Curated annotation (Swiss-Prot):
Protein name (record): GMP synthase [glutamine-hydrolyzing] subunit A
Membrane spanning stretches: none
EC number: 6.3.5.2
GO cellular component: cytosol
InterPro entries per UniProt: Class_I_gatase-like, GATASE, GMP_synth_GATase, GMP_synthase_A
Nucleotide-binding found in the keyword field: yes
Length: 188
């Protein structure tokens, strides 16, 4: 079985994504965001776009989104997905660093098994302000209107918070759910 690829977008927590996956016995590899598209297309069963400081440094991440693989975007990865499908990303009015309470509005896919509200760890200044037309909102908070999104027809998901950080309630579940989607056990 092919591994999941974790795309390093220079975020401070990207190595923790890899660690969280390995702790769940999920085969994964951290790759630079300059890895050739052909290598990503052939080498993995799913893609996790990690966070980072600036979307201009996201390398080939925008191209990875269009490979037909399941994709989970975390923080900056969410922004890449939103932009690629026509959404708008800009500086949030409140931003977020620290504990945030999110309200889940749709428990399918990557948020399956979570309670209605939960504490997560945020570390961002930008946010998705206009949701792309082919996406549904899965979660919201008082500081960010689009905390989690999912494509209506493709296995493409984005979350604003950091499930890889220990301060996020049961963050491992996002990775378990995404892996189940990648392996066909959960249709998302």
């Amino acid at each position: 079985m092919l591994p999941l690829y974790v795309v390093n977008n220079y975020g401070q927590f990207n190595h923790l994504i890899l660690r969280a996956l390995r702790d769940l016995d999920i085969d994964a590899k951290l790759i630079p965001n300059t890895t050739p598209v052909s290598e990503v297309r052939e080498g993995c069963q799913g893609i996790i776009l990690g966070g980072g400081p600036d979307i201009s440094r996201a390398g080939l991440s925008h191209e990875y989104v269009r490979l037909g693989k399941p994709v989970l975007g975390i923080c900056l990865g969410l922004h890449v997905i939103a932009q690629e499908f026509g959404g708008t990303v800009q500086s949030g009015q409140k931003g977020g660093y620290g504990a945030v309470e999110v309200t889940i509005t749709d428990h399918d896919g990557i948020l399956q098994g979570y309670p209605q509200t939960m504490q997560v760890w945020a570390s961002h200044a930008d946010e998705v302000v206009t949701l792309p037309g082919d996406f549904d909102r899965l979660a919201t908070s008082s500081i960010c209107g689009n905390e989690a999104i999912a494509h209506k027809h493709l296995p493409i998901f984005g979350i604003q918070w950091h499930p890889e950080v220990s301060h996020t309630f049961e963050g491992h579940r996002v990775f378990e759910n995404f892996f189940s989607i990648c392996t066909g056990q959960n249709k998302g």
